[in-house]
Amino acid sequence: MLDISRGRVPKLETLLDLAEHLADFKINELQLYTEHTFAYRNYKSVWQSWGALTGEEIRKLDTRCRELGIDLVPNQNSFGHLRYFLEHPKLKKLAEVSEPYEDGGDAATGNQEFVRRPSTLAPNHPGTLPFLRGLYDELLPNFSSDFFNVGCDETWDLGRGQSKRLCDARGKGRVYLDFLKRIHREVSARGKTMMFWGDIILKYPKLIRRLPKNVVALNWGYEANHPFAKEAAQFAKAKIPFYVCPGTSTWQTLIGRHDNALANLHAAAKAGKKSGAIGYLITDWGDGGHPQPLAISWPMFAAGAALGWNSKTFDERKLVPVLARDVFGDSKAAKAAFDLGFVHKKLGVKAINETPLGTVIAAPRPEDRELFCRNGLKWFAKIRRERVLGTFAEIEDLLRQAKLLSCSGSVLEMELNLAARMAAVSCMFMFWQQVAAVGNKIAMNCVGNLMVAELQKLDADFKAYWPQRNKATPKHCSAFLQWRMDDYRNCL
């Protein structure tokens, strides 16, 4: 499953090339995670600046996927994660909450406090289902698949606004389930089997048995220690068909967290086989603007394919040769793509769903900055200086060994260069914070000027690379490069 809703909407040519390679790895299902990036006729103002896939493009991709033995499954989030639809003047009334609010974070998951903007539909608003029907009637005819993933994960706003009284009276879990069933009826009426993310229903174990039996629950989790075994067993006990859904761990990292991903992919395969999962979905998310490119994800696509088919015979040592032969066409580039995913370990920081390399440079947009800096950046400045400098040196060394010092060559090589250089700037920023903290203005100005110069080069190279892979412009993906330039200039 490829995220196409956080900043990168791939061109049809990119997706066709992706499908060819996925087929080489015996991957037989592809989903494109969609919030607002299908070209719905009535909502051009929602998707236009992001780019969107058209019905014609989907039909062409669907045809080629069928020829390759891949089921292209439609994917449209239908409850939460609909922020950009709910900012549309005619759709604001469908939002559960009308204003942004500060989320207190979650100690269990490691999520920091930050601002949430309205993103969840009000299940009790009379216009909600007609809105979804309109999306489904336009989207689904473009797919030949018998399945449809309606999402419905992370409904953060539920019970905070329009449905508060209903949730207080009936319980949030029951309100969620009732709306999920209403969506299920819409999907069934269109001849599809409904898939949905299982995170919310798992919070209400007693309600799992009340799910319709002809659905597929998607049991997702992305950390090495995610309790797939426990969660999968709950769906199995209730006789609900389910997939296990691990991830590539590339999002909010720039260059990967391959150590975590390998453990996560393996745990999902093991638990899925034991509990009778009917599928294994490798997810590749784009949180934080999706700055990480496909080149960073390919090592874990390959690892996930191997583990999904037979975890007992998986041999990590074979990944680089296979990637060199089938994806990169070059052993040095393949090795760099694999090795970069372990560089973050040198910082000595264990974080959930991110690394400092990804989060430092891609910090939030200006309106969210104050809250993020108050709560989310504190520990970056505490990383030991020698670890930061060592990490920077290792990134530079890997680029040098792979002869990837310039943004040239194949598209995959360009992507490795850009991702690694952005990670290197994150190291520079951490070092800049450290010298600033001790009042070393000479070093602070020197490093700051170097960062601004490198960010300017990155911005130009990113814009030159972008149209080779993606639709629209990179403004939703690489805007943080300009934000960081402004930050540093203001401090020099």
Describe each model-derived feature in a short phrase.
Residues 1-175, 181-188, 195, 244-246, ...:
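Feature activates predominantly on carbohydrate-active enzymes
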Residues 20, 56, 60-63, 69, ...:
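Substrate-binding groove of N-acetylhexosamine-processing glycoside hydrolases
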